[in-house]
Amino acid sequence: MPQHYSGERRQYRRELRLSVPSCISLLYWIGSIVIGSVIIFWGKYHCFNDGAAHWARILQLRSGEIIPSFSKEYPEWIVYSEHGKIITFNNTAVNSPFVYFPSLIFRGDFRISSIATLICAASLIAVAIRIAGCYANIILAIAVLPTTFFGMIFPTADAITNSFSLLFIAVVLCLYQRDGALHFRHIVLLCVLSIMLGQVKITCSIIVLFVFFLLPKTTDKKMKVSLSLPVLCAFTSMWLWRMKTSHIAVAPNRVSLQ
């Protein structure tokens, strides 16, 4: 086969690998927004798991109280509704403001915050699918799981936790598949993402260890050592927030059942 035909075929395959994830990510984003919006506007509020507790934490953050202070008068953490009514909750008090950023940026009632959360979470996952390359189907399979999808349709910490975790994994997979060695700018990108990863639910911070899959991408010893920086950033970010909220004890007998 002539050499120029071989080159054209490789170029075609490369373009195909890039176009397929793009189509999948777009279809996922549109489908998630449409189906999620239908559920938000016509679904039942009481079907949202712990929706009241997450909403109470959002109201608390909107009032400017980043670190909850314990009320001696009530046995739980409290926040005041817009009508002055006291709302008690405790199992979401330790959550970082980062996991509620859609509701903090797009202020409004529960439904508006639900739409904002859905759009932001679906967008993060769509980007993850787009950049994951040949691993796009794996990201998509996780994204369409009922646990993942239904956690995106109301203001919850799970929405950003799941979507951002998938985005972080996709970035690592993208760097793993790219031609050429790692550069310092890639380490900086991973460090920035790791700082944010440290602010999601503590159980997902372990995902930062995926960066060690990039060790074969470089022969430079300094670059190999620098891959530990994202891990350090993630666990430092997590530790600083946990230190600020270490006084909050969420015991089983004090967890909201709403």
Model-derived segments and their meaning:
Residues V171, Y176-M196, K224:
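Short hydrophobic alpha-helices at membrane interfaces in multi-pass membrane enzymes
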Residues G51, W55-G108:
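Interfacial juxtamembrane loops and adjacent helix segments
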Residues I139-T147:
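Transmembrane and membrane-interface helices of multi-pass
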Residues T203, I207-Q258:
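Membrane-lumen/periplasm interface segments of specific transmembrane helices
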Residues F154-T161:
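Short acidic/glycine- and proline-prone juxtamembrane loop motifs at membrane-interface regions
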Residues F149-F150, H186-I202, I206-F213:
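Membrane-interface alpha helices of multi-pass inner-membrane proteins
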Residues Q11, R111-A136, L167:
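Transmembrane-helix motifs of polytopic, lipid-linked glycan transferases
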Residues M1-W42, G133, K224-L232:
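Start-transfer (signal-anchor) and selected internal transmembrane alpha helices
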